[in-house]
Regions:
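Long, acidic/serine-threonine-rich intrinsically disordered regions with weak helical/coil propensity
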Residues: 1-62, 337, 386, 433
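Intrinsically disordered terminal tails
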Residues: 430-432, 442-451, 457-498
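Alpha-solenoid HEAT/Armadillo-like helical repeat scaffolds in large eukaryotic proteins
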Residues: 82-87, 111-119, 143-153, 174-180, ...
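HEAT/HEAT-like alpha-solenoid repeats
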Residues: 76, 107-109, 122, 142-154, ...
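N-terminal segments that cap or nucleate solenoid repeat domains
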Residues: 3, 7-24, 32, 75-101, ...
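Structural detector for internal amphipathic alpha-helices that build alpha-solenoid repeat scaffolds
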Residues: 51-74, 85, 95-104, 114, ...
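Gly/Ser/Thr-rich loops at beta-strand to alpha-helix junctions
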Residues: 92, 119-121, 184
């Protein structure tokens, strides 16, 4: 079942008709429980009886549920589906009655978690008291995604605090399933708790930082791993300064996973730690990293050791060759000078498209723009190079011949050529911009068509538009995107008689 109240209302009808809870609700999905909770109370008009009631309450079972739940101690046992409906009922007395029966039904524990943030104080207090009696650490792990979801609600902090207390007191391995949960919010919670409680060694934290795809987890685990190493050094356990083998092994166990991680945050932390480990020379291997943050950390480490990253970049870029990493080109632009522009210009004809694109981006970063030379790069076969060249030319777009740019909008041109041409034409004002936008309002390319239509709708006549220009009126009429009043207003602003 999905996570909206409409599907929750449909599930409520199925439960009222006798369907099993697992059949009507995706019990493993926290969004499904939240949807059921809202869907049970979703009101729809009853045109026959002229009443507004949830759809499930119009069934025979729905009409009998209230009496069954409030019928006293001798009331007959209810199926889990009916109890689920009672736990989400719009009337607080029925929710409260359902809570007392649900406490002994583990399959209804998720709805007891939901009721801990109930808007009615008596129901909320009963739910919290009962949940504190039945929830254990294993159940908290199983329901953690739902617990964190409810914890973000008003009055929802109780469930997260309860789960945290249970997990802090549980054995360290209890958290293990949460480290690989599909929900990154759950993983963040688990690693934060593990770091606070010291459940993971520096090596385990480093492997987690290298493995996880979430940048928050990468940073948290990498920082904690390195902090753990520093603490060991301070307490004399690692013995790195004295050259102890145990200390070297400890750093290897932490640094190698970090340096080989896919995530930039983890690699950056590992590179920065090379200085403390006395291995600053290894940072040179990361000067050409694909991530800017890793390159910056590598430059810092080398400079602290007396190295010259700029000389390394100049040497590598001057040598060129197919093995030149694209990150080295970006690194030259990041710490180079305008005098390095010729090295970058030479790389705009490199055989590797990524190197050419980084070279063009580097020229833009150094604020070096030769319009004639940059214009030639608009015909590069690589879309990335064309995109970077267009961005570099954007500040001086009005220096380009608009008729030449208009011809590049033709549908037979490669897409990157058409996109770059429209980007540069749209940087103009007045008639040039309006002509380009109207030319593409029915373009087969969805994104180009959308951008063109947005440009038409935002167009205003500027000082360079001749007053009373008939072409403006014709273009606005062709666009067919504006209501009559707006067209009339634009024409009046352009000095056209209407």
């Amino acid at each position: 079942m999905g996570g909206d109240s409409g599907t929750g209302a449909a599930a409520a009808v199925r439960l009222a008709e006798g369907a099993a809870l697992r059949e009507a609700v995706g019990t493993a999905d926290p969004a499904a429980w939240a949807a059921l909770d809202a869907g049970v109370r979703e009101i729809a008009p009853d045109q026959d009886a002229y009443r507004w009631l949830p759809a499930w309450e119009r069934t025979e079972a729905g009409r009998a549920l209230a009496e069954a739940l409030t019928g006293g101690s001798d009331a007959r046992p209810l199926a889990e589906g009916w109890l689920a409906l009672g736990l989400c009922h719009r009337q607080g007395r029925i929710r409260a009655a359902a809570l007392q029966r649900a406490a002994a039904r583990p399959e209804l524990l998720p709805l007891m978690v939901v009721r801990c943030s109930d808007w009615a104080p008596p129901v909320r207090e009963d739910a919290r008291r009962l949940l504190a009696e039945v929830l254990d650490a294993e159940s908290a792990v199983r329901l953690m995604a739902l617990i964190l979801r409810i914890g973000r609600r008003d009055r929802g902090e109780f469930v997260t605090d309860l789960a945290t207390r249970l997990l802090r007191a549980a054995p360290r391995d209890t958290l293990a399933p949460l480290y690989t949960d599909a929900d990154r919010t759950v993983r963040r919670y688990a690693y934060r708790l593990a770091v606070e409680e010291g459940h993971l060694s520096p090596a385990e934290l480093a492997r987690a930082a290298a493995r996880d795809t979430d940048t928050v987890i990468q940073s948290r685990c990498a920082d904690a791993a390195l902090a753990g190493l520093a603490q060991r050094d301070a307490s004399g356990q690692a013995g790195l300064a004295s050259g102890a083998v145990a200390g070297r092994d400890a750093y290897d166990d932490v640094l190698e996973p970090l340096l080989g991680a896919r995530g930039a945050q983890a690699r950056a932390a590992g590179v920065t730690a090379l200085r403390r480990a006395g291995r600053s020379g290894r940072a040179a291997g990361f000067l050409g990293d694909r991530a800017a943050v890793v390159r910056a950390c590598a430059r810092y480490v080398l400079r602290q050791a007396g190295g010259d990253p700029l000389a390394w970049y100049r040497e590598r870029c001057a040598a060129g060759g197919p093995a030149l990493p694209a990150g080295a080109v970006s690194g030259l632009a990041e710490c180079g000078e305008r005098a390095d522009a010729e090295l970058l210009w030479a790389l705009t004809s490199h055989a590797v498209a990524a190197v050419r694109a980084r070279a063009v981006a580097g020229l833009r970063a150094l604020d070096v723009t030769d319009v004639a030379r940059m214009r030639e790069l608009l015909d590069d076969p690589a879309p990335g190079v064309v995109r970077e060249a267009a961005l570099a030319l954007l500040p001086c777009a009005r220096m380009l011949d608009e008729r030449w740019l208009m011809r590049r909008l033709a549908t037979e041109r490669p897409r990157q050529v058409r996109v770059s041409a429209f980007l540069l034409l749209n940087a103009h004002e007045g008639l040039v911009r309006l002509r380009a936008a109207v030319a593409l309002i029915d373009d087969p390319d969805d994104r180009l068509r959308y951008r063109a239509r947005q440009s038409v709708q935002r167009w205003r006549p500027t000082a360079d538009v001749p007053r009373g220009s008939a072409e403006v009126g014709e273009l606005l009429d062709r666009a067919r995107l504006l209501d009559p009043y707006t067209v009339h207003r634009r024409k009046w602003e352009a000095g056209i008689k209407v």
